[in-house]
UniProtKB/Swiss-Prot annotation:
This is Endoribonuclease YbeY. Single strand-specific metallo-endoribonuclease involved in late-stage 70S ribosome quality control and in maturation of the 3' terminus of the 16S rRNA. GO terms for molecular function: metalloendopeptidase activity; RNA endonuclease activity; zinc ion binding. Zn(2+) binds at H122, H126, H132.
Length: 158
């Protein structure tokens, strides 16, 4: 199983080896979750100013956040299946603030890579339909992301 990934660092502040690590982590998470071969995901690294604009425009919240996901494969009520639906899905976009990732890595006492990995997996699970609107959903999603990160080898001490 292999994702088609487009990873862009608009800030130019994330080293290439970390971007490559994000790609490996997403491939690992996709395999763990049984995602269809050829599914597409984009990851964009931005600064706080840019993610605040996106957060305000799409979520009505005028402050920077750490990660935002836009799932493209959500089935709405009454939607008709499109011809070619057997093609690999375009799962969506994950947008991560490198500024927030740095702040949170310092706050939690772990590496920037661990925080970027956490935010990447968190965003990816949202693309797969996981959420944390209820206590039950939160427990399921947070357990899943912890399992993926630990199996990959990116634990809190990383």
């Amino acid at each position: 199983m292999s994702l088609i990934l487009d990873i862009t660092d608009e800030t130019g502040r994330v080293p290439e080896d970390r971007l490559a690590e994000i790609e490996k982590l997403l491939q690992f998470a996709a395999a763990e979750e049984g995602v269809a071969d050829g599914a597409e995901v984009s990851v964009t690294i931005v600064n706080n100013e840019e993610i605040q604009k996106i957060n305000k425009e799409y979520r009505g919240k005028d402050y920077p956040t750490d990660v935002i996901s836009f799932a493209l494969e959500e089935d709405g009520e009454g939607e008709v299946e499109i011809i070619g639906a057997d093609m690999p899905p375009v799962l969506g976009d994950i947008i991560i603030s490198v500024d927030k990732a740095r702040e949170q890595a310092e706050e939690y006492g772990h590496s920037l890579m661990r925080e970027l990995g956490f935010l990447t997996v968190h965003g990816f699970l949202h693309l797969l339909g996981y959420d944390h609107m209820t206590e039950e959903e939160e427990k399921e999603m947070f357990t899943k992301q912890k399992e993926i990160l630990n199996r990959y080898g990116l634990s809190r001490s990383s």
